[in-house]
Amino acid sequence: MSKINKLEHIRNIGICAHIDAGKTTTTERILYYTGKSHKIGEVHEGGATMDWMEQEQERGITITSAATTCRWQDKIINIIDTPGHVDFTIEVERSLRVLDGAVAVFDGVAGVEPQSETVWRQADKYNVPRMCFVNKMDRMGADFYRCVEMLKDRLGAKPLVIQLPVGIEENFKGIIDLVKMKVVIWKDESLGAEYFEEDIPADMKDKAEEYRAKLLDMVVELDDHVMEKYLSGEEVTAEEIKRLIRKGTISAAFYPVLCGSAFKNKGVQPLLDAVVDFLPSPTDIGIVKGMEVSTGEEKDFPISVTEPFAALAFKIMNDPFVGSLTFIRIYSGKITSGTTVINTVKNKREKIGRMLLMHSNNREDVKEASAGDIVALAGLKDTTTGDTLSDIDQPVILERMEFPEPVIELAVEPKSTADQEKMGLALSRLAAEDPSFRVSTDHETGQTVIKGMGELHLEIIIDRMRREFKVEANIGAPQVAYRETITKACEIDYTHKKQSGGAGQFARVKIIFEPLKDVKDLKDEDKIFVFESKIIGGAVPKEYIPGVEKGLNNIRETGVIAGYPMIDFKATLVDGAFHDVDSSVLAFEIAAKAAFREGMPKGNPKLLEPIMQVEVITPDEYMGDIIGDLNSRRGQIQSMDPRGNAQVVTANVPLAEMFGYVNTLRSLSQGRAQFSMIFSHYDQVPSQVADIIKAKK
């Protein structure tokens, strides 16, 4: 197969969903049926191939996105298995950035759950074409049709049903293929490897005809010629239907919906067929956005083997045998071992040593890789997640990834002073792997502080430090990552002057500080801090203005109320003055810091806290107690909906009130209720609570 043709035969896909919807089991079955795995790994037995970290096998959840390559028909499928737990959304985010398509797995009983919504929104952000697999159709309470309705209501998606289940719950035995209008039944004795087609039974004929008509109504809209044929009563062929399903999936006009039970080995092969038939190849995506380093011009670069080399590093992983591995998605060109490329973000050269194709945590050495491939590179020195590797002669920077701010922090210290250095090394390695995990030193106490996306996230970091780096640590109580902001605009004119013999220092700045919510035409709503210079006529020379921005950026890390980072504000430099001899970048940096300290208290500063969206699923009888408890935690109930024989309560609750909630919920519901939470937004802390927080600082 020539390299250029090869691109059309590649499918880079992610399998993503809510925790426990059955993503890892689905991936295991895919590996089994494509011949990559000789035995089926079960998640609940701790034997799943994709869950290769010790913690994952113990907890039965997927933490890091393992990448694996398999073949189906004549196509190469690169699969990234992503975690469904909310503390690991960063893994999902960076996987989606480099994928061409995704399979969203839904629990046939629970339907669309909170994390499913988060993942769906992330996929929307990166315009990832996707299809839906309604799993667990064999389980008590599974309802395919309700799940399809939830896709519309919860996600605002346009589902295109292309399969219907045959039998429900324990009698689920196969599917109706609405394209071929045939029933597919699996043989249990062959572990689902053998299946056969038969005619649709009479009792399901009407349902199948109804959904076939809905399918045709949606797909023929994409092609005038086929629509004319359909409206004139002519038969639309299966090939035409498949072509239009592919067209609509790639353009996100709709999302094909399939069903099955991965655990019971039913529905996986048609899912693989659909991945190959309907999800895009790199050539369907066609372009990747980036910037030409030489001109600074943003442009679209073609995805092609014949273009210069460009790749995005999307994950760093420490392998116990190979050391640090950098996973890259190659967008254009090709690369061979021994080549030198440039990291255009850091402006550092990197020599390509070992290149590996990964199957979960088994490795296969390769000498060459090209556009469309996902490979791991061993031994890169300066490359981190989100960096671009590029051809030295034609350097480009591909669109960067954005990572969320951590919402929870812990103080850690090694149990013995001898481990201090080891702990520092371990934490810096783990931070290199995971951009949503940060390490810093508290200036006042000298303590090491680790920050992450939730309690489980930090728990696993500490666990990995113990297992992989042999460092035992004492940990403090979890702390909330509070922030500060201003609520009204203020102006400050500050002059920094220092004369003490020899060279002096002089800088004058006039800055307007204002809340970001008051700023019109803000391109990125999520910007933490915006700086703008409106200096006209050289009141402050151009070369000194970066000093003002740097000073403000540094000083905003310690706010004026309780020393928490300041966010959601804009600083505009409107005037200033300089001295020919005594002014410098440093002098303007100092002046900006002092202006911040003096000006911010006039902006009516407020303390902000992270608010979490909490979803509790509970039997009816505990509803009252659970709502009462959420209200006592300063929660605001958003909605209450029935789901099967349970109730779903959605509330916005401050993170500070949610520590240890898992134990409270267990005792309130005798262990029958469950909850999940995701970060929603920052909001002002009520004044009486703010006083307590200030007193503690």
From Swiss-Prot:
Cellular component annotations (GO), alphabetically ordered: cytoplasm
Subcellular localization(s) per the UniProt record: Cytoplasm
GO molecular function, one term: translation elongation factor activity
Pfam families to which the protein is assigned, alphabetical: EF-G_D2 (PF22042), EFG_C (PF00679), EFG_III (PF14492), EFG_IV (PF03764), GTP_EFTU (PF00009)
Organism lineage string: Bacteria, Pseudomonadati, Pseudomonadota, Alphaproteobacteria, Rickettsiales
CDD domains hit by this protein: EF-G, EFG_III, EFG_mtEFG1_IV, EFG_mtEFG_C, EFG_mtEFG_II
Keywords from the named record: Cytoplasm, Elongation factor, GTP-binding, Nucleotide-binding, Protein biosynthesis
Name of the protein in question: Elongation factor G
PROSITE patterns according to UniProt: G_TR_1 (PS00301), G_TR_2 (PS51722)
Major localization listed first in the record, in broad terms: cytoplasm
Organism, as annotated: Rickettsia massiliae (strain Mtu5)
